[in-house]
């Protein structure tokens, strides 16, 4: 192999080309590669954050769903308790009303019974006087013996 001027000229031209590429072409290419690498890394980070955010959102949605179910169950339980309470109150009111009606009826019966007893005493007094009059064959003054008749009626 002969080293001649063309080989040296080609080597110098290649060296100038390499220096030119290193000075003007290589930095934008490296910058573009770094920028692309950064974009890819940012995209991967964003995807990772999105996956974490999705997982957190799903956990939060699940927690809210569980809370809503628990709250619904609590509301249903409160409604059942309130329903039972209303039924118990209605039963108690009905019992009180029945006792009141019963007491009123007993009072009316007692009053009626006392009225009948008084009427019976009065009739018994008249019958006793009439019977005594018939037995004795004489007239007995009812006004004079009213006290005696009242005592007799009270004893009966």
Swiss-Prot record:
Name the source organism.
Pseudomonas fluorescens (strain ATCC BAA-477 / NRRL B-23932 / Pf-5)
An example of a Gene Ontology cellular component annotation for this protein is:
plasma membrane
Give the multimer and partner information. F-type ATPases have 2 components, F(1) - the catalytic core - and F(0) - the membrane proton channel. F(1) has five subunits: alpha(3), beta(3), gamma(1), delta(1), epsilon(1). F(0) has three main subunits: a(1), b(2) and c(10-14). The alpha and beta chains form an alternating ring which encloses part of the gamma chain. F(1) is attached to F(0) by a central stalk formed by the gamma and epsilon chains, while a peripheral stalk is formed by the delta and b chains.
A Pfam family matched in the record: ATP-synt_B
Alphabetized GO MF terms: proton-transporting ATP synthase activity, rotational mechanism; proton-transporting ATPase activity, rotational mechanism
Print the keywords alphabetically: ATP synthesis, Cell inner membrane, Cell membrane, CF(0), Hydrogen ion transport, Ion transport, Membrane, Transmembrane, Transmembrane helix, Transport
Which PANTHER family does the annotation name? ATP SYNTHASE SUBUNIT B (PTHR33445:SF1), ATP SYNTHASE SUBUNIT B', CHLOROPLASTIC (PTHR33445)
Q: Which InterPro entries match?
A: ATP_synth_B-like_membr_sf, ATP_synth_b/b'su_bac/chlpt, ATP_synth_F0_bsu_bac, ATP_synthase_B_chain
This protein's major location comes to membrane
Name the family the entry cites: Belongs to the ATPase B chain family.
Q: Species lineage, top-down?
A: Bacteria, Pseudomonadati, Pseudomonadota, Gammaproteobacteria, Pseudomonadales
How this chain sits in the membrane, per its record, is: Single-pass membrane protein
Q: What job does this protein perform?
A: F(1)F(0) ATP synthase produces ATP from ADP in the presence of a proton or sodium gradient. F-type ATPases consist of two structural domains, F(1) containing the extramembraneous catalytic core and F(0) containing the membrane proton channel, linked together by a central stalk and a peripheral stalk. During catalysis, ATP synthesis in the catalytic domain of F(1) is coupled via a rotary mechanism of the central stalk subunits to proton translocation. Component of the F(0) channel, it forms part of the peripheral stalk, linking F(1) to F(0).
Name of the protein this chain belongs to: ATP synthase subunit b
Per the UniProt record, which residue ranges are transmembrane? 12-32
Cellular compartment(s): Cell inner membrane
Q: Which HAMAP family match?
A: ATP_synth_b_bprime (MF_01398)
């Amino acid at each position: 192999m002969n080293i001649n001027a063309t080989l040296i000229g080609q080597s110098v031209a290649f060296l100038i080309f390499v220096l030119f590429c290193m000075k003007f072409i290589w930095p934008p290419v490296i910058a573009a590669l770094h920028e692309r690498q950064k974009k890819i890394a940012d995209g991967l980070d964003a995807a990772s954050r999105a996956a974490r955010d999705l997982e957190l959102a799903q956990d939060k949605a699940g927690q809210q769903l569980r809370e809503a179910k628990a709250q619904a169950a609590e509301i249903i339980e409160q409604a059942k308790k309130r329903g039972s309470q209303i039924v118990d109150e209605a039963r108690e009111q009905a019992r009180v009303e029945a006792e009141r009606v019963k007491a009123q009826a007993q009072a009316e019966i007692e009053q009626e019974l006392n009225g009948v007893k008084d009427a019976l005493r009065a009739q018994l007094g008249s019958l006793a006087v009439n019977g005594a009059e018939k037995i004795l064959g004489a007239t007995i003054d009812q006004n004079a013996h009213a006290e005696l008749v009242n005592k007799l009626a009270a004893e009966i």
